[in-house]
Amino acid sequence: MRTNPLALGVPTLVEKNVGHIVQIIGPVLDVVFSPGNMPNILNSLIIKGKDTAGQEINVTCEVQQLLGNNKVRAVAMSATDGLKRGMKVIDTGAPLSVPVGGATLGRIFNVIGEPVDNLGPVDARTTSPIHRPAPAFIQLDTKLSIFETGIKVVDLLAPYRRGGKIGLFGGAGVGKTVLIMELINNIAKAHGGVSVFGGVGERTREGNDLYVEMKESGVINEQDISGSKVALVYGQMNEPPGARMRVGLTALTMAEYFRDVNEQDVLLFIDNIFRFVQAGSEVSALLGRMPSAVGYQPTLSTEMGSLQERITSTKEGSITSIQAVYVPADDLTDPAPATTFAHLDATTVLSRGLAAKGIYPAVDPLDSTSTMLQPWIVGEEHYETAQGVKQTLQRYKELQDIIAILGLDELSEEDRLTVARARKIERFLSQPFFVAEVFTGSPGKYVGLVETIRGFKMILSGELDGLPEQAFYLVGNIDEATAKAMNLKVEN
């Protein structure tokens, strides 16, 4: 942690070590320094000056390689337009540092910690470097407890661990970002904790939607910014690869401060962790490294590990991380999602088939897993109910070929009952979201774990066999389903 004596972080650079640009290839710069004054790897370099049109230039780079002959190769964190050979480069003598603490809440930052929301400067007296070691083994906390989200399918079948790492897997357009927005909304309301959102290489429109959504739902308090519950860090699709590769670390650094210094439980959302790998792959190619499997960088697992190992619970506080993972071509064996799997406590897999049926959230109940779904952690009742739901859905899946060829009438009485219950369960796993009220037209619902278990137990026991399956679609708890069934009966 470094404390900057300059209030409001007015940057002044001491020009101790100055070099100049000798080569520019896209976002990669080669810089020459005087002998004996080479910057360290990961040091931050700053280039200031004017372009040919007289516009001010202020580009931050990060040293990646020492090339010999007093040359270093650095990757730019913003566009290199307007840079020329011979321009002066200042070595800051330290890694990139970003503002941390209460001043970051309610604000949007870019990768180098500058506010980009037009709300004026941020108090940057307390800053922290984005590269730091993971907590030591003896500092880690190993308590097991469930993190309730209020989303039925998640809490019942793949519960999240407090202080754990959760992956949301899905192809394009199946609802990862909407699910993340709902989790931020529910957690801010139910747990009152602080969240940090890292937008890594996703759409600018989604980032803007999220910001507006947070202001409307009160997660960001426009009247009193310091009363907000979330800090946002964006490095969107249009940014150079250097920015997309480091923006996850910037968000993580802000979350670590809340955990280590403020001793809070923090939520870290990363959307999308695949783009972090993708940016690393682009940078790796630009630096001339030999590609590995499927064209990814050879350092894939090292880069992923250095980020993921810092996301953990210590004796001071916890970071619970929820990461969206884009799955290229819906192939879970691709090196990027496969490397991510190794670090996760729970996986929430989103299914295109369920999304096509209109069942949202489109969480696949059979593919999603959690290390927390053990009877000695969640209790016998929860475990038995979850297993009953999975067995019913698995049997329904096995029978689908027979139904497609021969029809329902050819099934035994027992199998027909299983199919009817499975279809009710499938629909009851859908739920109206607060953040999707504009799409669904239904008010959002937060369903507690006790209510969720009670509802599914009633379906499995056969108490609700007489109700039509459409009564279970897009409702909150089971009482709403029975009320909806009564309304349907009256209408018919």
UniProtKB/Swiss-Prot annotation:
Broad class of where this protein is predominantly found: plastid
Reactions catalysed: ATP + H2O + 4 H(+)(in) = ADP + phosphate + 5 H(+)(out)
Pfam families xref list: ATP-synt_ab, ATP-synt_ab_N, ATP-synt_VA_C
NCBIfam families: atpD (TIGR01039)
Topology within the bilayer: Peripheral membrane protein
InterPro entries associated with the record: AAA+_ATPase (IPR003593), ATP-synt_VA_C (IPR055190), ATP_synth_F1_bsu (IPR005722), ATPase_a/bsu_AS (IPR020003), ATPase_alpha/beta_chains (IPR050053), ATPase_F1/V1/A1_a/bsu_N (IPR004100), ATPase_F1/V1/A1_a/bsu_N_sf (IPR036121), ATPase_F1/V1/A1_a/bsu_nucl-bd (IPR000194)
Chain residues that bind ATP: 170-177
Subunit note: F-type ATPases have 2 components, CF(1) - the catalytic core - and CF(0) - the membrane proton channel. CF(1) has five subunits: alpha(3), beta(3), gamma(1), delta(1), epsilon(1). CF(0) has four main subunits: a(1), b(1), b'(1) and c(9-12).
The enzyme's E.C. designation: 7.1.2.2
Name of this protein: ATP synthase subunit beta, chloroplastic
Keywords recorded for this protein, A-Z: ATP synthesis, ATP-binding, CF(1), Chloroplast, Hydrogen ion transport, Ion transport, Membrane, Nucleotide-binding, Plastid, Thylakoid, Translocase, Transport
Function: Produces ATP from ADP in the presence of a proton gradient across the membrane. The catalytic sites are hosted primarily by the beta subunits.
Superkingdom per UniProt: Eukaryota
CDD domains the record matches: ATP-synt_F1_beta_C, ATP-synt_F1_beta_N, F1-ATPase_beta_CD
Family of this protein: Belongs to the ATPase alpha/beta chains family.
Classification via PROSITE patterns: ATPASE_ALPHA_BETA
Subcellular location: Plastid, Chloroplast thylakoid membrane
SUPFAM superfamilies assigned: C-terminal domain of alpha and beta subunits of F1 ATP synthase (SSF47917), N-terminal domain of alpha and beta subunits of F1 ATP synthase (SSF50615), P-loop containing nucleoside triphosphate hydrolases (SSF52540)
GO terms of biological process kind: proton motive force-driven mitochondrial ATP synthesis
Gene Ontology molecular function, alphabetical: ATP binding; ATP hydrolysis activity; proton-transporting ATP synthase activity, rotational mechanism
Any one GO cellular component localisation term in the record: chloroplast thylakoid membrane
